[in-house]
């Protein structure tokens, strides 16, 4: 009976759009890609998607530091991320962004359904506020001591030591991560998702087999502690989606981030005519939905996400596949040691297949951390891929090419041995299917040892010197190449670049189902080097370059600050001499004879000043400035100009021309007030 192809949708966690992809990120994307490639080899219909997580205060603040719009920053970051994933041959069908119309519509739809179904609650909360920056502080911008385990230097929403979640107000001795100031408590109305209403459903789902045992056990601890309502809104200023019918309130990034899976798939469906969004996301969908994620975001994916889907009438994930962290040389990745390696830096020095293989050899279905030991990395890749697999082809291909014009023998030299190799496919397939790629690699390398032992025993280099044994030589070498073909078929999900070169050499596609039929009387192409041995010097150069990346990141910041550095330090007495006041622009008009100046009539609350300001290009319709409050230097000596006397200076930011921005105070300021 022919097995019916499965419909599968696979996602990876969305990389945050405020930084580069590093080798820690790549573990997840490689793991998922290996699993996806295996499923595709077995004939299943797999759609593999991802997107950038592009909202939140960190992105807003970083864009401000760079002097660019958040949209500009996330667009550049998306391009870099996609280039890195392509360099590692991650076979995404679609890569999108949470800052998209698809995601805006779906976020609004899900929120609307949750609200209509009674799962959204409104209440006024006390929230930490940075008095220096004039903004409410989101969870990740408050740091302090965990209220559960008392670990220091933890974020305001969850503890990286014990995994607990809490509100920022529970944090002990909080500090603003933006300014370092001690936050103040202020009140604000927020919207909450009623997570406790889904407790029974979530507990049943937890034990349904949808989660690894380690994850299910951790979730039970959260259930025992009691689920809390989840704050899903943030106050302006915030870069994200404004909540419908709630001006100044924005969806918290963790609400629209997982919806980004749906948004990316919707974008793919709109591009193609053969995909139906509802077939994969409707309540009774028969498609499989798998999320590959790291253990640091289990809470959001195992509680909030399935509850949101359930409450809004969509299907829940079939399974969450959770992995551990990456360490390098037994320690946390370090910029100072050069082990915080960006994906782009790696690709400048080494073949992507090398890291894919090393990760595959270490991965299992458990949530264990993976150590990238750089010396072991070099030794294992060279020993396994070069010495065992590729060497098997090179030892035999030369004879086939030179002595037999690239033609393989018409029968197998050892049919029983070949059957041993193809029979092993069932166990290797089961390992891949269950995400036990480490076990699959061990079984494949055991076969590689057998294949090389066969060649050693048959010694084709000796047979080649014996007159009249051409048929034996062709049979031995053809057997070696057929065994190489089976090995590379099993390695195809792991080594896509080497697979492509192998298929060119063998003159055939590597197919799992095809290996039961050996290549007999088959024409292969002239052998070319398939894989280069890793040179330890290249690894050292990569580490050194990563140290240089850190120095560059520390010393070169793009944006206004880099273009116009801070001036020499002045003392407080010098600064105190400058008297800045709030001024009301009563009249603003063009200056005849000047293409740069505007004449401003300013009210200082009892005194009127005339100021000439070079802001005409930025404000071509000066009447729009009238009635606006601004800041002026009130004690600047009057300056006689061709058009009249200027009695001060208004304050503005920007490089000049059209890019200049008049400063305005917050509401409540009055003309004449001193700016301190």
Swiss-Prot record:
Residues the record lists as binding ATP: 335
GO cellular component terms attached to this protein's record: cytosol
CDD domains (UniProt xref): Anticodon_Ia_Met, MetRS_core, tRNA_bind_EcMetRS_like
Residues that coordinate or bind Zn(2+): 146, 149, 159, 162
Reaction catalysed by this enzyme: tRNA(Met) + L-methionine + ATP = L-methionyl-tRNA(Met) + AMP + diphosphate
Cofactor binding comment, as recorded: Binds 1 zinc ion per subunit.
A Pfam family this chain is assigned to: tRNA-synt_1g
InterPro entries xrefs: aa-tRNA-synth_I_CS, Anticodon_Met, Met-tRNA-synth_bsu_C, Met-tRNA_ligase_1, Met-tRNA_synth, Methionyl/Leucyl_tRNA_Synth, MetRS_core, MetRS_Zn
Domain tRNA-binding per the UniProt entry, residue ranges: 574-676
Motif ('KMSKS' region): 332-336
A GO molecular function held by the record: metal ion binding
Entries under PROSITE patterns matching the protein: AA_TRNA_LIGASE_I, TRBD
Short sequence motif 'HIGH' region: positions: 15-25
Cofactor: Zn(2+)
Stated family: Belongs to the class-I aminoacyl-tRNA synthetase family. MetG type 1 subfamily.
Family annotation (NCBIfam families): metG (TIGR00398), metG_C_term (TIGR00399), PRK00133.1 (NF001100)
Quaternary context: Homodimer.
HAMAP family, per database record: Met_tRNA_synth_type1 (MF_00098)
Function: Is required not only for elongation of protein synthesis but also for the initiation of all mRNA translation through initiator tRNA(fMet) aminoacylation.
Entry protein name: Methionine--tRNA ligase
Species of provenance: Pectobacterium atrosepticum (strain SCRI 1043 / ATCC BAA-672) (Erwinia carotovora subsp. atroseptica)
């Amino acid at each position: 009976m022919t097995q019916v192809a499965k419909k599968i949708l696979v996602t990876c966690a969305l990389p945050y759009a405020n930084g580069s992809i590093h080798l820690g990120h790549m573990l997840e994307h490689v793991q998922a890609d290996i699993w996806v490639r295996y499923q595709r080899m077995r004939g299943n219909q797999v759609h593999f998607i991802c997107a950038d997580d592009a909202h939140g205060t960190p992105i807003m603040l970083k864009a401000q530091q760079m002097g660019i719009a958040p949209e500009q920053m996330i667009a550049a970051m998306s391009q870099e991320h996609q280039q890195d994933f392509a360099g590692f041959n991650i076979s995404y069908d679609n890569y999108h962004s949470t800052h998209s119309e698809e995601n805006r519509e779906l976020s609004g739809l899900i929120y609307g359904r949750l609200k209509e179904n009674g799962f959204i609650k409104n209440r006024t909360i006390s929230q930490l506020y940075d008095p220096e920056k004039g903004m409410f502080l989101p969870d990740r911008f408050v740091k302090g001591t965990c209220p559960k385990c008392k670990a220091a230097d933890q974020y305001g929403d969850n503890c990286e030591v014990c995994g607990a979640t809490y509100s920022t107000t529970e944090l002990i001795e909080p500090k603003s991560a933006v300014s370092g100031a001690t936050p103040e408590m202020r009140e604000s109305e927020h919207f909450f998702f009623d997570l406790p209403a889904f407790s029974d459903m979530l507990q049943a789902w937890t034990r349904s087999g949808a989660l690894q045992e380690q994850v299910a056990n951790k979730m039970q601890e959260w259930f025992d502690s009691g689920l809390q309502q989840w704050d899903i809104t943030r106050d302006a200023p915030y870069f994200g989606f404004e909540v419908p019918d709630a001006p100044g309130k924005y969806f918290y990034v963790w609400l629209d981030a997982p919806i980004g899976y749906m948004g990316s798939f919707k974008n793919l469906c709109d591009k193609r005519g053969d995909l139906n969004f509802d077939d994969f996301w409707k309540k009774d969908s028969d498609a499989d939905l798998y999320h590959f994620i790291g253990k640091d975001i289990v809470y959001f994916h195992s509680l909030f996400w399935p509850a949101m889907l359930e409450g809004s009438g969509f299907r829940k994930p079939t399974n969450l596949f959770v992995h551990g962290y990456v360490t390098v040389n037994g320690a946390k990745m370090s910029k100072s040691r050069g082990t915080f390696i960006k994906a782009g830096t790696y690709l400048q020095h080494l073949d992507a297949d090398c890291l894919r293989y090393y990760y595959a050899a270490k991965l299992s279905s458990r949530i264990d951390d993976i150590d990238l030991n750089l010396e072991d990395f070099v030794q294992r890749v060279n020993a396994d891929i070069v010495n065992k697999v590729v060497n098997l082809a090179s030892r035999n291909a030369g004879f086939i090419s030179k002595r037999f014009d690239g033609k393989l023998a018409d029968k197998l030299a050892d049919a029983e041995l070949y059957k041993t190799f193809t029979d092993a496919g069932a166990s290797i397939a089961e390992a891949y299917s269950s995400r036990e790629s480490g076990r699959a690699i061990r079984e494949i390398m055991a076969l590689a040892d057998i294949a090389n032992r066969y060649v050693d025993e048959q010694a084709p280099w000796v047979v080649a010197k014996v007159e009249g044994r051409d048929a034996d030589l062709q049979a031995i070498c053809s057997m070696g190449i057929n065994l190489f073909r089976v090995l590379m078929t099993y390695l195809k999900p792991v080594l896509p670049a080497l697979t492509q070169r192998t298929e060119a050499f063998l003159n055939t596609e590597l197919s799992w189902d095809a290996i039961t039929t050996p290549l007999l009387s088959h024409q292969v192409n002239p052998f070319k080097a398939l894989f280069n041995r890793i040179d330890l010097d290249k690894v050292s150069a990569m580490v050194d370059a990563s140290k240089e990346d850190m120095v560059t990141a520390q010393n070169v910041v793009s944006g206004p600050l880099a273009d116009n550095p801070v001036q020499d330090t002045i003392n407080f007495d010098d600064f105190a001499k400058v008297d800045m006041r709030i001024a009301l622009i009563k009249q603003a008009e063009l200056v005849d004879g000047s293409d740069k100046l505007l004449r401003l009539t300013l009210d200082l609350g009892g005194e009127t000043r005339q100021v000439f300001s070079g802001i005409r290009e930025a404000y071509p319709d000066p009447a729009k400035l009238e009635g606006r409050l601004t800041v002026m230097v009130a004690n600047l000596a009057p300056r006689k100009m061709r058009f009249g006397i200027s009695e001060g200076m208004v304050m503005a930011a920007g490089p000049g021309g059209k890019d200049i921005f008049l400063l305005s105070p917050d509401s409540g300021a009055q003309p004449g007030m001193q700016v301190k």
